[in-house]
Amino acid sequence: ILTVDPNNSETLYLGTDDDGVYKSTDGGESWKKLTVSSLSKSFGVGDIIVDPQNSNNIYIGTVDYFRLSESRGVLGDFGIYKSTDGGATWEEFNVGLNHLGVFSLELSEENRILYAGTRAGGVYWISLDD
């Protein structure tokens, strides 16, 4: 998943299948891995949204995955996470989701509603003005 900041085309966010989120502030020349402290070091990203009204507000939908290693399997974390500081820190934003894998996010600018499409087939929404 590649998302361009709608207010700065040099700022890009890259979500991976099982290695988290990366950020570039130079149009993709270099990348920095973002740390989401409440998630495991490796997690899958279903979608990334940058708020067009405030580029510091970023939402990621994380997806569940199962990775096999030589000794065991590991179930990944999933849900919605929000940053209000351009990706420096993150908090869980799973109001009503009960940790469902999120594969799609859409933000209605007019209504300020964030929609989340889940693995379970449902669509959830939350007002960002609350």
Give the positions of each predicted feature:
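Extracellular glycan-interacting surfaces
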Residues: 1-130
